[in-house]
From Swiss-Prot:
Primary localization: virion
Residue ranges annotated as motif Nuclear export signal: 12-21, 85-94
Location in or out of the cell: Virion; Host nucleus
Keyword Transport: yes
Any one cellular-component term (Gene Ontology): host cell nucleus
Protein function: Mediates the nuclear export of encapsidated genomic RNAs (ribonucleoproteins, RNPs). Acts as an adapter between viral RNPs complexes and the nuclear export machinery of the cell. Possesses no intrinsic RNA-binding activity, but includes a C-terminal M1-binding domain. This domain is believed to allow recognition of RNPs bound to the protein M1.
Domain of life the protein comes from: Viruses
The protein, known as: Nuclear export protein
Length: 121
């Protein structure tokens, strides 16, 4: 994973954790946790691709990896919709910038996961 992506994740997660969105702070914490989870999942797929011999161990260790992949894409779609919704409803420029960067990062992560998964299939 390239260092810009790592710093982007860390920067966005840090800024999102500082936001005070009133009653929706639990939802925001959920988004942060899901983003962190997606980052870890994307990293593990990338590592598996780099060690192509791990494909068989990945499949034998977790025969439901395609199902997991499908769930991750659903999670990404949910997060994208949630970020878009928050982006539409906020007038705070700090939040707008943060959510726009989060949206861009989600789209990049989705593309990377697709690329990795096609290489593993």
């Amino acid at each position: 994973m390239d260092s810009n992506t790592v710093s982007s994740f860390q920067d966005i997660l840090m800024r999102m954790s500082k936001m005070q969105l009133g009653s929706s702070s639990e939802d925001l914490n959920g988004m942060i946790i899901r983003l962190e989870s997606l980052k870890l999942y994307r990293d593990s797929l990338g590592e598996a691709v780099m060690r192509m011999g791990d494909l068989h161990s990945l499949q034998s260790r977790n025969e439901k990896w395609r199902e997991q992949l499908s769930q991750k894409f659903e999670e990404i779609r949910w997060l994208i919709e949630e970020v878009r919704h928050r982006l539409k409803n906020t007038e705070n420029s700090f939040e707008q910038i943060t959510f726009m960067q989060a949206l861009q990062l989600l789209l990049e992560v989705e593309q990377e996961i697709r690329t990795f998964s096609f290489q593993l299939i």
